[in-house]
Amino acid sequence: MKSPKLAIDPEKLRGAAGKAVSTMKVLANEDRLLLLCQISQGECCVSEIEEQLDIHQPTLSQQLGVLRNEGVVNTRRQGKNIYYSIADPALLEILATLYRLYCPKGNA
């Protein structure tokens, strides 16, 4: 049985390949993927993320730094807290696709 073909123009992809590869590298770390999934639910601060994901603060800070440097999250300071949000709506689509493909339908 043949797999369905996708309508992909290799020349168009060539121009976007660098950005696509950068995005995939960001997502290729379990902690960063979980962080992005949490942030995709709405703007949140470090303490909220730490509580929700049980990722220890040093790891959390390191991975949030990578996300900031790659430009995939926006930051906003309010008092002592820094709030994070997803910078690129396309990333939300990628996260939704990953969730749909890899998370069992019976789980919330």
Segments predicted by a language model, with ranges:
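Intrinsic disorder/low-complexity segments enriched in polar/small residues
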Residues: 3, 58, 63-64, 79
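Alpha-helical residues within the helix-turn-helix
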Residues: 51, 62, 68-69
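A generic alpha-helix structural signal
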Residues: 21-24, 64, 95
